């Protein structure tokens, strides 16, 4: 690399950074690719915004049935730019779902799910389910009237499943009724379990795209 700095040369000698950069920058991009092929990348950007703003809110949010609502109000009214952080979190959540839907439609309409990219499609659909789960679990965290009744209805849906329905309901709620255990479980899912799951499937998704390349035109 021409005119590289001594620091860059030191790292490049040990990590072969330039080889990685050359491999990424020389990847072939088919001529039929247009702006609609950026929808997946926009979805990723929305997720990163979600991660950053969500992490910021964990400094103030208190996952208890007594303090959850008041902690959200404190974030919105007393914390500097707290209202902006939460608003960006909500807006980017809606944008992420919208971009995800459009991305799925684009892949389906252009045949990007066909052989040999079936597993890429499967990981994408799995991430779509995880994204919806983010919405369900996050909706309940303010623990206001809307959040409480939403989690009560959602957690009661598995009761219709034969044999294991009641067990699934109790597993989600942490007991027979909606309460502190329910909020704790939804908070854990929203801030720990689902982000890690999404990160794992996202990594697999990108590695397969990297390996197989962008699908050709129909």
From Swiss-Prot:
UniProt-annotated binding residues for heme c: 38
Membrane-spanning ranges: 35-55, 93-113, 119-139, 189-209
Coiled-coil ranges per UniProt: none
Cellular component aspect of the GO annotation: plasma membrane-derived thylakoid membrane
Record keywords, A-Z: Electron transport, Heme, Iron, Membrane, Metal-binding, Photosynthesis, Thylakoid, Transmembrane, Transmembrane helix, Transport
Annotated positions binding heme b 2: 89, 190
Residues given in the record as heme b 1 binding sites: 103, 205
Membrane topology: Multi-pass membrane protein
Cofactor names: heme b; heme c
Cofactor: how bound: Binds 2 heme b groups non-covalently with two histidine residues as axial ligands. Binds one heme group covalently by a single cysteine link with no axial amino acid ligand. This heme was named heme ci.
Location(s) in or outside the cell: Cellular thylakoid membrane
GO molecular function: electron transporter, transferring electrons within cytochrome b6/f complex of photosystem II activity; metal ion binding; oxidoreductase activity
Gene Ontology BP terms: photosynthesis; respiratory electron transport chain
Any Pfam family the entry gives: Cytochrome_B
Similarity annotation: Belongs to the cytochrome b family. PetB subfamily.
Described function: Component of the cytochrome b6-f complex, which mediates electron transfer between photosystem II (PSII) and photosystem I (PSI), cyclic electron flow around PSI, and state transitions.
Further comment: Heme 1 (or BH or b566) is high-potential and absorbs at about 566 nm, and heme 2 (or BL or b562) is low-potential and absorbs at about 562 nm.
Subunit structure: The 4 large subunits of the cytochrome b6-f complex are cytochrome b6, subunit IV (17 kDa polypeptide, PetD), cytochrome f and the Rieske protein, while the 4 small subunits are PetG, PetL, PetM and PetN. The complex functions as a dimer.
Name the UniProt record assigns to this protein: Cytochrome b6
Upper lineage: Bacteria, Bacillati, Cyanobacteriota, Cyanophyceae, Synechococcales
């Amino acid at each position: 690399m021409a005119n590289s700095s001594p620091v860059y040369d030191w790292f490049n000698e040990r990590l072969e950074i330039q080889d990685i950069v050359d491999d990424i920058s020389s990847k072939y991009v088919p001529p039929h690719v247009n702006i609609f092929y950026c929808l997946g990348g926009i979805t990723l950007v929305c997720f990163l915004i979600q991660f950053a703003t969500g992490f910021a809110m964990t400094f103030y949010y208190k996952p208890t049935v007594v303090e959850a609502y008041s902690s959200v109000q404190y974030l919105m009214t007393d914390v500097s730019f707290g209202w902006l952080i939460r608003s960006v979190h909500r807006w980017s959540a809606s944008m992420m779902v919208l971009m995800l839907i459009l991305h799925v439609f684009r892949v389906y309409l252009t045949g990007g799910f066909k052989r040999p990219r079936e597993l890429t499609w499967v990981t994408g659909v799995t991430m779509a389910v995880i994204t919806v789960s983010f919405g369900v679990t996050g909706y309940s965290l303010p623990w206001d009237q809307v959040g409480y009744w939403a989690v009560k209805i959602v957690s009661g849906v598995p009761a219709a499943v034969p044999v294991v329905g009641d067990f699934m309901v109790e597993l989600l709620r942490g007991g027979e009724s909606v309460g502190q255990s329910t909020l704790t479980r939804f908070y854990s899912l929203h801030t720990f379990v689902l982000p890690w799951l999404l990160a794992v499937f996202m990594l697999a998704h990108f590695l397969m795209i990297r390996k197989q390349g962008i699908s050709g035109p129909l």
